[in-house]
């Protein structure tokens, strides 16, 4: 069960903010003035998450004293608090009825008034809501009127939705720079991340040159001039990279995590392939072949690696087990059978209910 703790800057004191160990707590965010915290918890009903505001405070002696206020009772299921608005008067909430259907709500911090910002019928995904820097809109990832998760902005006054970019792939993550000059987005293209920055003043997107792999954990510097992110790939273990925007420079690797003496040539970059399934559906897969000095002229035995989920995806990430098998002479075949994420909603729904065994036939 998730719990929250507040530590002093020196680390000399740690305070339990949750104070309800029997409940699950989901983090929302800090208010702009640093005096309040938004969060969700199932304290009153284990099947329902409600939204709370925690007032952070301390006595003159430095003793911690804070209190929770129930802001809004959830409708049932996941009702997860998010960011405060730039002026601190509102909080975003994501209502999560299912993996393929979400609603974005805006709560008034003073009154608890609840506004559903994305009313709809049927199943539509709305994910990763974030406030626009001016507080007049909300950015969101959605497959509204489309097959892929694309980045859109919802106008708070009118409720109108405008797409920022509509690539034919999922936008998997994004961040907005302080001041609102840049919007950085990571796009899942056939399983590999493509990183781009969009000037919010209307300029053309800028693509970053990065190796084959996956971008995670993006964050802008305080001045908005640099993007910092975590990156890993088949030939790159997890490291921190930085990208200076607007200067025509390439992303630069900042850290160099240890590989325990394993040489670079031991790590293999896979080939993206496709094959026809029983009904003609094209199935994407990553094919890893042993290094040439290990493989020689013989055909290697193959390890087939179907991912779990089922709504998940095999991606070109750093995998020490794969590296071991490859250097022992095994090839690895990692298919993304129907039902996998990353290839659009229709592809993801192709193994639903009675079609579940079709994904097995893909193998």
Language model segments and positions:
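Hydrophobic or amphipathic alpha-helical targeting/insertion segments
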Residues: 3-9, 13-15, 27-37
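Multi-bladed beta-propeller domains
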Residues: 7-24, 44-46, 52-80, 87, ...
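Blade-terminus and WD-like Trp-Asp/Gly-His loop motifs, strongest in beta-propeller folds
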Residues: 28-36, 82-90, 128-137, 174-182, ...
